């Protein structure tokens, strides 16, 4: 607890004889910013909100030809970094491109199954979108393609509208429609510079959602891993486990389990080897492809498919056919496609931007978030017209891409070429690939999404964040992916509303032998001047919190008056509000200050404001509250305010 100063010989002193250090004899008045007309004020706010990075700064004072080239480079960064591209960079991109291709091919086949689509659509989605991104994206390290979480989310949302088994053609059309509008959503957010909207999904909520989705995805793989033919369509953990145990007596296939368990052990071992030595990064990257080749050959020579081992069977050969004519632009399915596309697009965008920023920070370069959104959006728009479903940045592939020494987005082009060759010549070889291998590959891929260390850190740092994390996690695994996402968004919004409507306030005291005033709970040695109560408001004061701020200040005052009365100290005569953290105030906030001022007047307590910012002091003058309060009751610092109050204090108890 802080100590309270006691008056000695009529002058305010503190325990131990401490007297607050006097500020400079020159007392500065609080500056009032020059008046701006409404249009200029609006344009300034608009610019700071949407164009704070001044995207046109490079275009200033440049000739038309230079501006055209800068504009072209802005939309297609390939024209920027492509000018300085060298064979040395190509060598790094070639190695990383071949490495991520070996990882993506088996993953794509499995991820397409998560979305309830034919495996070929997974390969299609790693051919066209990476080519578009390579031309328009600003990240050097991100690897594009289908990902587990988005595939599961898309499959769950689509299945809720159309059964893929009874109406496969309509289901496919809705998938392309959702992909188209996912791209439109992403591109629109970037074009209109609304990227800050994805920040409403907090890091804690994303950690919980991803962890829950990873467990859900792993549980879904038990169908292929155990060789179960009849499996629930639901994704919650109770329904899945119930389906698994019901099939235990007659539905499990021991050959399938043996294949899946053996290669999952191999994949996990390769991952451990890769972590132990950075030089062996290629081991876990190439392990999935080795698993597919070996298991496919084993099933082919033993004809294990005749013993109940489920295989991929037919995989169409050839490149992506056009699908523009399959997209719904009218009818009931249009609204469904828009709704699913917006949700899938936002989740895909959140994951991709987070991955891009992570690896950009590692290599000390910047990515333009809004340009990234446009690039990601355009690749999905083009993808939807070429038989692709929602693609985004893959963390596992991007990590391998980074470790392999990629230099530019050319690594995505190399990967696309390898996928193209696979589609043209190698797809028949996947006929005997066992589903258990695809299940093992997906389980191995989603394990890193369960970030226990991050959850522990969130719990230690912020309990409210942890509630968002755990709420999203349990929502996904016990109900459904979309409910988990809804919980994640809802709790994130609730936290924002709570912080806005219930801002923190603090009682300030003087740090001994200084003119500095700080929170008495943070600095127990800080002392309070008798007869003066100093309170800091740590937020802008708006209609949403103005009543709370006024009531909280009055409660601080009431509590302090009770302490003063019990200790027979001079009563509170001055209430100082430290306003430096108050960045803005609206009419409701000003009205709350007026009510507080009138209430204090009735109790013979003078209200004083210290260090209001330019926006705040300007509005206080425009509303005439500054005149009501009196110019001599507005000070530049708390120390100035306390110094002015001290001679006016009486010893009245």
Swiss-Prot record:
- Induction of its expression: In roots by sulfate starvation.
Any single Gene Ontology cellular-component annotation: plasma membrane
- Control of this protein's activity: Interaction with OASA1 negatively impacts the transporter activity.
Q: Which residues lie on this side of the membrane: Cytoplasmic?
A: 1-91, 138-141, 275-280, 361-372, 431-438, 488-653
Q: What is the effect of changing residue 511 to T?
A: In sel1-8; reduces drastically sulfate transport activity
Pfam families, alphabetized = STAS (PF01740), Sulfate_transp (PF00916)
What GO terms in the biological process aspect are recorded for it? cellular response to sulfate starvation
Q: What is its main location?
A: membrane
Q: Where is this region: Disordered?
A: 1-30
**Subunit structure, interactors included:** Homodimer. Interacts with OASA1 through its STAS domain.
- PANTHER family under this entry? SULFATE TRANSPORTER
Q: Provide the protein name.
A: Sulfate transporter 1.2
Q: Which organism is it from?
A: Arabidopsis thaliana
Q: What is the lineage of its organism?
A: Eukaryota, Viridiplantae, Streptophyta, Embryophyta, Tracheophyta
């Amino acid at each position: 607890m802080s100590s309270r100063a006691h008056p000695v010989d009529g002058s305010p002193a503190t325990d131990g004889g401490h007297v607050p250090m006097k500020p400079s004899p020159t007392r500065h008045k609080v500056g009032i910013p020059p008046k701006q007309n409404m249009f200029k004020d609006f344009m300034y706010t608009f610019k700071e909100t949407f164009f704070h990075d001044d995207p046109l700064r490079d275009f200033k004072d440049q000739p038309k030809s230079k501006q055209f080239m800068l504009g072209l480079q802005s939309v297609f960064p390939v024209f920027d970094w492509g000018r300085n591209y060298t064979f040395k960079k190509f060598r790094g991109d070639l190695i990383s491109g071949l490495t991520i291709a070996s990882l993506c091919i088996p993953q794509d086949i499995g991820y397409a199954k998560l979305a309830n689509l034919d495996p070929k659509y997974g390969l299609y989605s790693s051919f066209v979108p990476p080519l578009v991104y390579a031309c328009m994206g600003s990240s050097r390290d991100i690897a594009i393609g289908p990902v587990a979480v988005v595939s599961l989310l898309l499959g769950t949302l689509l299945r809720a509208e159309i059964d893929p088994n009874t109406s496969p053609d309509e289901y496919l059309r809705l998938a392309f429609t959702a992909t188209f509008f996912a791209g439109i959503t992403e591109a629109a957010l970037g074009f209109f510079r609304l990227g800050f909207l994805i920040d409403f999904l907090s890091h804690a909520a994303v950690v919980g959602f991803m962890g829950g989705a990873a467990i859900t995805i792993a549980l879904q793989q038990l169908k292929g891993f155990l060789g179960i033919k009849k499996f629930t369509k639901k994704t919650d953990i109770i329904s899945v486990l119930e389906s698994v145990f019901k099939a235990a007596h007659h539905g499990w296939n021991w050959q399938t389990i043996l294949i899946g368990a053996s290669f999952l052990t191999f994949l996990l071992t390769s991952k451990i080897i890769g972590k132990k030595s950075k030089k062996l990064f290629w081991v876990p990257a190439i392990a999935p492809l080795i698993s597919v080749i070996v298991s496919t050959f084993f099933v082919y020579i033993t004809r294990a498919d005749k013993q109940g081992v489920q295989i991929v069977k037919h995989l169409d050969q050839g490149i992506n056919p056009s699908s523009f004519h399959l997209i719904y632009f009218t009818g009931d399915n249009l609204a469904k496609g828009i709704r699913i596309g917006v949700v899938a697009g936002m989740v895909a965008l959140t994951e991709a931007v987070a991955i891009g920023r992570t690896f950009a920070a590692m290599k000390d370069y910047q990515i333009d978030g809004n340009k990234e959104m446009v690039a990601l959006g355009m690749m999905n728009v083009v993808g939807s017209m070429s038989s692709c479903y929602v693609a985004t940045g893959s963390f596992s592939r991007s990590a391998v891409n980074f470790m392999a020494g990629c230099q530019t987005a050319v690594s995505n082009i190399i990967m696309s070429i390898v996928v193209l060759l696979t589609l043209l010549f190698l797809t028949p070889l996947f006929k005997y690939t066992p589903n258990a291998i695809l299940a093992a590959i997906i389980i191995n891929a989603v394990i890193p999404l369960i970030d226990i260390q991050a959850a522990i850190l969130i719990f230690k740092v912020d309990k409210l964040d942890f509630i968002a994390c755990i709420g999203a996690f349990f929502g996904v695994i016990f109900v459904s992916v979309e409910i988990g996402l809804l919980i994640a968004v809802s709790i994130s919004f609730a936290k924002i509303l709570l912080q806005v409507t219930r801002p923190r306030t603090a009682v300030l005291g003087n740090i001994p032998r200084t003119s500095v005033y700080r929170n008495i709970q943070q600095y127990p040695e800080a002392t309070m001047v008798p007869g003066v109560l100093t309170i800091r408001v740590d937020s802008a004061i708006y209609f949403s919190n103005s009543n709370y701020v006024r009531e909280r200040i009055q409660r601080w005052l009431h509590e302090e008056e009770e302490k003063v009365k019990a200790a027979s100290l001079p009563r509170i005569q001055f209430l100082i509000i430290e306003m430096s953290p108050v960045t803005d105030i609206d009419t409701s906030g000003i009205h709350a200050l007026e009510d507080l001022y009138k209430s204090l007047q009735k109790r013979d307590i003078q209200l004083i404001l210290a260090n209001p910012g330019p926006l705040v002091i300007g509005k206080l003058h425009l509303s005439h509250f500054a005149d009501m309060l009196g110019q001599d009751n507005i000070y530049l610092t708390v120390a100035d305010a306390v110094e002015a109050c001290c001679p006016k204090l009486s010893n009245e108890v």
